[in-house]
Swiss-Prot record:
Organism: Bos taurus
Keywords assigned: Acetylation, Cytoplasm, Exosome, Nucleus, RNA-binding, rRNA processing
CDD domains: RNase_PH_RRP43
Subunit structure: Component of the RNA exosome core complex (Exo-9), composed of EXOSC1, EXOSC2, EXOSC3, EXOSC4, EXOSC5, EXOSC6, EXOSC7, EXOSC8 and EXOSC9; within the complex interacts with EXOSC5 and EXOSC6. The catalytically inactive RNA exosome core complex (Exo-9) associates with the catalytic subunit EXOSC10/RRP6. Exo-9 may associate with DIS3 to form the nucleolar exosome complex, or DIS3L to form the cytoplasmic exosome complex. Exo-9 is formed by a hexameric base ring consisting of the heterodimers EXOSC4-EXOSC9, EXOSC5-EXOSC8 and EXOSC6-EXOSC7, and a cap ring consisting of EXOSC1, EXOSC2 and EXOSC3.
Database matches in InterPro entries: ExoRNase_PH_dom1, ExoRNase_PH_dom2, ExoRNase_PH_dom2_sf, Exosome_comp_Rrp42_subfam, PNPase/RNase_PH_dom_sf, Ribosomal_Su5_D2-typ_SF, Rrp43
Protein name: Exosome complex component RRP43
Location within or outside the cell: Cytoplasm; Nucleus, Nucleolus; Nucleus
Family recorded in the similarity comment: Belongs to the RNase PH family.
Xref: Pfam families: RNase_PH (PF01138), RNase_PH_C (PF03725)
A single GO molecular function term of this UniProt record: mRNA 3'-UTR AU-rich region binding
């Protein structure tokens, strides 16, 4: 009976749970799904991480290549993110060129990188005007059950912290790059941006970490990205219901709390990887 009602009237079915301050999956309105991260998942990548947010699963692989610095910024390198949402992760997506949702997600990640200054692009310069690192960050969604932006941001951060680049010098006689694979160093991660997403129901009610079904039924969504200093790095709201100043402040306060949880989880994972 309940399954039939959910199929015929999914929103009304959902509202009955919201009235009791809970959700069909058993969570409270402000409760996040179980979050896990595995670092170094791809042996052939220069850095990688696998993040699970409930059923939503994203893997990030980073490959470092040489490139010429931009002419207008000869002392900078590049960080190039790309989010892939294939039919593998959800039947909603099709093979071929990136769809709108994938393009929006890629631009969101690019904005997070730029606004948070997670990496100073000057740190990627090898020789000013001649050679720089290009970090290709491929974020592949393996299972899409909502809140893809939070999962992608977490996977990117963990993968960047996992990157190790070899020492590179320019031979003055030959003007060629010489790579010392025996001497590698980690990236200098300047900030730790963490995304926290919300869904708005009936223009007023906020829930955190929405599933795919919740995103579909919601009247709006919002993603807030904060760093460890409590600074707002990015705010993403693709239309939908408006929010009052008080609601927005509530979202930012919850995002600060969520940042501490994610940062603690990531610190524990990287601490466990260090040789004793």
């Amino acid at each position: 009976m309940a399954a039939g009602f959910k199929t015929v009237e999914p929103l009304e079915y959902y509202r009955r749970f919201l009235k009791e301050n809970c959700r069909p999956d058993g969570r409270e309105l402000g409760e996040f799904r179980t979050t896990t991260v595995n670092v170094g998942s791809i042996g052939t990548a220069d850095g990688s991480a696998l993040v699970k947010l409930g059923n939503t699963t994203v893997i990030c692989g980073i490959k470092a290549e040489f490139g010429a610095p931009p002419t207008d910024a000869p002392d900078k390198g590049y960080v190039v993110p790309n989010v892939d949402l294939s039919p593998l992760c959800s039947s909603r997506f099709r093979s071929g060129p990136p769809g709108e949702e994938a393009q929006v997600a890629s631009q969101f990640i690019a904005d997070v990188i730029e606004n948070s200054q997670i990496i100073q692009k000057e740190d990627l310069c090898i020789s000013s005007g001649k050679l720089a690192w290009v970090l290709y960050c491929d974020l592949i969604c393996l299972n899409h059950d909502g809140n893809i932006l939070d999962a992608c941001t977490f996977a990117l951060l963990a993968a960047l912290k996992n990157v190790q680049l070899p020492e590179v010098t320019i031979n003055e006689e030959t003007a060629l790059a010489e790579v010392n694979l025996k001497k590698k160093s980690c990236l200098n991660i300047r900030t730790h941006p963490v995304a926290t997403s919300f869904a708005v129901f009936d223009d007023t009610l906020l829930i955190v970490d929405p599933t795919e079904e919740e995103e579909h039924l919601a009247t709006g969504t919002l993603t807030v990205v904060m760093d460890e200093e409590g600074r707002l790095c990015c705010l993403h709201k693709p239309g939908g219901s408006g929010l009052t100043g008080a609601k927005l402040q509530d979202c930012m306060s919850r995002a600060v709390t969520r940042h501490k949880e994610v940062k603690k989880l990531m610190d524990e994972v990287f601490k466990s990887m260090k040789p004793k």
